[in-house]
Amino acid sequence: MNIRLNAKVISTIPVFIAVNIAAVGIWFFDISSQSMPLILGIIAGGLVDLDNRLTGRLKNVFFTLIAFSISSFIVQLHIGKPIQYIVLMTVLTFIFTMIGAVGQRYSTIAFGSLVVALYTTLTYIPEVNVWFINPVMILCGTLLYSVVTLIVYLFFPNRPVQESVAKAFCALGEYLDTKSCFFDPDEVAEIEKKHLNFAMKNANVVTAFNIVRTALFYRIRGQHRHPLTQRMLRYYFAAQDIHERANSTHFDYQQITEKLKNTDLIFRIQRLLELQAQSCKEITASLRENKPYHFNKRVERALLGTLHSFDLYRAQHLNDQDELIDIQTLLDNLQSINWQLRQLAQDTTVTEQLAQIHTEQITGLKNISAVIFSHFTFESPLFRHAVRLSIVVFLCCAIVEFFQFNLGYWILLTTVFVCQPNYSATKVRLRQRIIGTILGVVVGSLLPYLNPTLELKLGLVVLTSTLFFFFRSNNYSFSTFFITLQVLLSFDVMGFDTAAALMPRLLDTLLGAAISWFAVSYLWPDWKYLQLDKVSHQALRSDAVYLLHIISQLQFGKSDDLKYRIARRNAHQYAAALSTTLSNMNNEPVKYKAYLQKGFDLLKLNYSLLSYISALGAYRDRMKNLQQTAQFLSGFYPVAKKIIYTLEHIEEIPEAIFNQQQESIETHLKELEKQEMTAEERAVFSLPYQQLNLITQLLPQFYGYFKKEINCQSAGAL
């Protein structure tokens, strides 16, 4: 079905239809007094809506209803018993938060169950004789949303995964745009500063790839694979290859740009990268608009012009063979990117052998329990967040029960939605929540002047609920504004005095926000558990594993198997984790002043290492078709394995042994470069030698960084 609707619009269709049905039911059966739990049940269902194939969605609905039933009924039975209720909510908060250790899907349903417990409390009316009516109405709302979303899925089965692929190519386009800045001849002196921005863009690409991988994993588990899923799988593999090619570095950008700055070649390389970035964005547009992608011939002409310019440059610089090989390798990678972009415009299918997606999936009660208990340490951010949030929930419940605040559990609702695992995210969410609530209260105070009918109120409930979901993922202030209006309208529909709810809503939000800020600032704050050294160790080890897989495949022949892609993904994920850690630290420059500069130096260092390794990875295609000489086999692989060993154990090696190992590696590489080779052999084998040389030059800098870390820790212990 070629219906061209924005993915965000499609994602809000289920809540729009479900709330419309609920509104008609409330009006027809005259059950205004139960409107709020029914609507909140729909919202809770939307909060845990997870993309999956049809059978996976049915399983999600089944487990969601079970989790919501347990949460809602057990809370309903303890409302009115202050001590029991406070203890119950505290325990539920800790358990539901820790379940997040198992994976994103468990985390989403667990958080939804906690929200349902709060919704059950907020909609509790002591005067109602039927004790189970609130949980039943919440579950009816969730079931209604689930049925509607399954029907909508049948009309748009692949749009979520298509949108995730579109976002990946959008991130890839921005990445290539940033890469092109390295070939700006007028900004040679600024190249060093651009590495940080490039690393951040790389982290965005990795995040987008992870979302695509998870979406595809759940789509290709079944026997039948939709043709569009196969197409998205092909796009995903192409994006990965483009990323590896673009991430490859064969030279010092500053040196090569300085040499080329008075030629047209550097301008052509920059323009080619910009056009390739534009092609990625055109792929994004074609996926979002559900149109075929057409390869832009300008990109091909730009490539041919660049190759012609290089031929002229080579004819004038025949003595600079090393430099020519570097540029030729860069152009080979740009040609490969062009090929990937061109073949995406053609109707081909990915082979079954390549169609393997790996994602972490924990199954079995024993494994799930083991994973959860492995986080029972204050070194785990999840455990700190679970304990912190549990204390906050306990405090909020105690305040409400002790002071008997009217509608006081809005304090608790605010803290649960605002309190995030780290300080920076909480601070942003706090500001957005307060702004949205204030605007909502101001606009809500004007509603009584409209003197709306029940039909108009229900229509506004539909509108505000839909807009809440539309803005939920990209503008939390707007979503808070619309949910505040929705709550005030629901109070009016139920027959309560809306004016009496305005100030409690505002004051409770402010109090909840203050408690959340205090919690993340003083209860096991991030700065006390700085993970920079840990993340840097993980990043370096994953780089070593990535290099090991590349060397193995160079030695025994390329096979783009699952293990290689997992190693590559892990290296990029830990690089992204390092980037994210520094980004969070940079948001609090006063607290992390002592760590920031060396952290950014390490980030650039790790990114250089990863780009040098990626260049070898991209070279596997050529090596597969070459006859490796005995001279190359006996020289290259032993020294490569020494480098891998050094990377894996760099923080453990004594200084004297490291210096000896470094000298041995450098000596071997110099001997290899002096070996007699034909011009053809030099053109083929010089790049692997060169990449090992580049990696070797980084080893002393890595060793110096980790040596300082060890010395600092020893001094701290004394």
Swiss-Prot record:
Membrane topology per record: Multi-pass membrane protein
Gene Ontology CC terms: plasma membrane
Location (main, coarse): membrane
Pfam families: FUSC-like, FUSC_2
Biological source species: Haemophilus influenzae (strain ATCC 51907 / DSM 11121 / KW20 / Rd)
Similarity annotation: Belongs to the YccS/YhfK family.
Lineage, uppermost ranks: Bacteria, Pseudomonadati, Pseudomonadota, Gammaproteobacteria, Pasteurellales
Entry superkingdom: Bacteria
Protein name per the record: Uncharacterized protein HI_1680
Residue spans crossing the bilayer: 9-29, 60-80, 83-103, 136-156, 391-411, 506-526
